[in-house]
């Protein structure tokens, strides 16, 4: 039986080795601009073309060896662990939705809002819900219709009210233990989610408090008649299980598995779902992660060929000429993920794309991996939160019947965490991790 040798060595640093990444970014960006829709162009196709290009330009190996080298990158243990987590996260999210856990969490949050603290309350609701469910899009879909209706009743500016939810949604997108961005950032940097959370939370907390304070100030004088929401307390349990076990430091796969079990127990006990319907929900959730899994595999393979051909070494070599210590390295990491996010309109993909490069930079300059993971996640959320063609902005604008461009000027939280991210770099904050 013939065995194909896998080469783990790299060639001399080469600018040409980076061309597959440039092909991907240019292809996806240019084609998206032509059709004027960043979500009609399949990102999987862009990765497929750039992957084929990467295989074609790889020299010194037979075609079979090139494909095997590509496959080695796709089968990297960190990539595979990310995929297993994506599968579990998809199963949990869909089953939680189908048993009514999302609606229960939303209603509980809304019932607790006092009228004169409506703005601050919705910001907190968006923060809590996104932290619980790990998705900013889900938070936007759940809350924007409600806050849009309130805006109509109170005469408040629709764009301003919508921006409250969009901004708050990125609090959880940035920090949640089950967020794709958190998973991608921690896996590519090789640090624990709990440790990344501690650093990331210290960076963004001041921004969250300032924005919250502003909403409290703006909320005084508002007179909104209270509404009664039906709260099904037991259906909140799956999210509480996820939050509590995550904060206790359980393995993320175990956290999600316990959450999945909780959705089944709660759904069956309350009669919200039958056993086979629950199985169907789990299957639908896992299948729904298919595109992200394919993208992750192809990104891993393409980046392995870039590494093998000397592309990573070239970037490190060029950046190290101008980087002065940890501060410069952290700025570079933030810039890398920000640029990738502008081109892909997807913060998870941006992190997956540049994460390995950021990890190399962090290693070379002694940047704490908890800090580099936080920088990756925070800068990606900043860009995703303000680009008008991001999924969150497009969804919010559609639900509120306004233009995405109208929302941007009121996105105080994404702007705030950008300021704090830059402050954390130049002021060396938090001190312990800088």
Residue ranges and their predicted role:
Residues 1-87, 199-295, 434:
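Hydrophobic transmembrane alpha-helices of multi-pass small-molecule transporters
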Residues 83-93, 112-146, 319-359, 376:
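Hydrophobic alpha-helical transmembrane segments of multi-pass integral membrane proteins
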């Amino acid at each position: 039986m013939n065995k194909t040798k896998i080469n783990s060595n790299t060639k001399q640093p080469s600018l040409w080795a980076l061309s597959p990444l440039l092909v991907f970014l240019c292809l996806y960006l240019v084609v998206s601009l032509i059709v004027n829709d960043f979500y009609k162009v399949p990102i999987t196709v862009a990765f497929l073309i750039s992957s084929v290009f990467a295989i074609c330009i790889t020299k010194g190996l037979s075609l079979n060896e090139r494909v095997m080298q590509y496959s080695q990158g796709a089968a990297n243990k960190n990539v595979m662990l990310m995929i297993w987590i994506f599968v579990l996260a998809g199963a949990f999210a869909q089953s939680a939705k189908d048993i009514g856990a999302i609606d229960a969490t939303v209603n509980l949050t809304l019932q607790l809002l006092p009228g004169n603290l409506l703005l601050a309350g919705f910001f907190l609701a968006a923060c809590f819900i996104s932290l619980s469910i790990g998705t900013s899009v889900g938070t936007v879909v759940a809350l924007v219709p409600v806050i849009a209706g309130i805006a109509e009743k109170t005469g408040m500016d629709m764009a301003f009210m919508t921006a409250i939810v969009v901004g708050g949604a990125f609090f959880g997108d940035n920090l949640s233990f089950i967020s794709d961005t958190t998973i991608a950032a921690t896996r590519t940097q090789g640090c624990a989610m709990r440790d990344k959370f501690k650093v990331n939370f210290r960076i963004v907390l001041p921004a969250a408090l300032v924005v919250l304070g502003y909403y409290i100030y703006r909320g005084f004088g508002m007179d909104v008649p209270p509404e009664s929401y039906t709260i099904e307390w037991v259906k909140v349990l799956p999210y509480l299980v996820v939050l509590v076990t995550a904060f206790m430091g359980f393995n993320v796969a175990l956290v999600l598995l316990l959450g999945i079990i909780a959705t089944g127990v709660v759904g069956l006990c309350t009669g919200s779902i039958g056993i086979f319907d629950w199985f169907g929900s789990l299957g639908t959730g896992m299948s729904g992660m298919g595109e992200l899994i394919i993208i992750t595999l192809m990104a891993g393979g393409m980046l392995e060929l870039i590494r093998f051909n000397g592309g990573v070494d070239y970037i490190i070599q060029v950046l190290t000429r101008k980087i002065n210590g940890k501060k410069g390295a952290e700025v570079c990491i933030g810039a890398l993920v920000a640029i990738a996010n502008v081109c892909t309109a997807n913060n998870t993909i941006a992190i997956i794309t540049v994460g390995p490069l950021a990890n190399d930079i962090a290693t070379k300059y002694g940047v704490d991996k908890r800090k580099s993971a936080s920088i990756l996640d925070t800068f990606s959320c900043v860009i995703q939160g303000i680009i008008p063609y991001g999924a969150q902005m497009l969804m919010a604008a559609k639900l509120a019947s306004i233009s995405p461009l109208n929302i941007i000027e009121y996105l105080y939280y994404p702007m705030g965490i950008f300021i704090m991210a830059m402050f954390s770099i130049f002021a060396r904050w938090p001190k312990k991790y800088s």
